[in-house]
Amino acid sequence: MLSEDTRHRAAKGLSARSVDATLQATAQQLAELLAAPGAPFTHAIGGGMERRLAANGWKGMASAENIAYGNDTAAETFVQWMGSPGHRANILGDCSLCGFGHAVSRDGTHYWAANYGTKAPTGGGTGGGGGRVPWWRWVLNWWR
């Protein structure tokens, strides 16, 4: 899934993301929750994205999530997501970190999850050193 994310971002002149272990674990957990027998297909499963991320130790400022089911490959899933304005915005957004999950239900249905985020800035929250995005930029992105 990382290669698909990178490919779609590169096509728009955007840099590749780095995989974050917490985002990866949370996305995999989400895919497995969605693939469980009788589970609803919703971002609210497991208490919702913010709760799942916090439970796994996420300390980031910004986060976004994509989910899908029924596609057999990551490539098909990214084509579907790129056709949806909200999912597309997450893929092409400013988050610098990512994590992906994939699970297959008992009936053979594929479930896909992507979590995107950026670590909280250091140094007082007025700008983010070390190449991090200033806090105010995340507020603008959230508000869009």
Regions found by a protein language model. Name each.
Residues 1-37:
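A short alpha-helix/helix-coil micro-patch that ends at or immediately precedes a cysteine
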Residues 60, 68-144:
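Disulfide-stabilized extracellular recognition modules
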Residues 24-72:
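Short, surface-exposed glycine/acidic/tryptophan-bearing loops
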Residues 17, 21, 39, 51, ...:
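Flexible, active-site-adjacent loop/turn segments at secondary-structure boundaries
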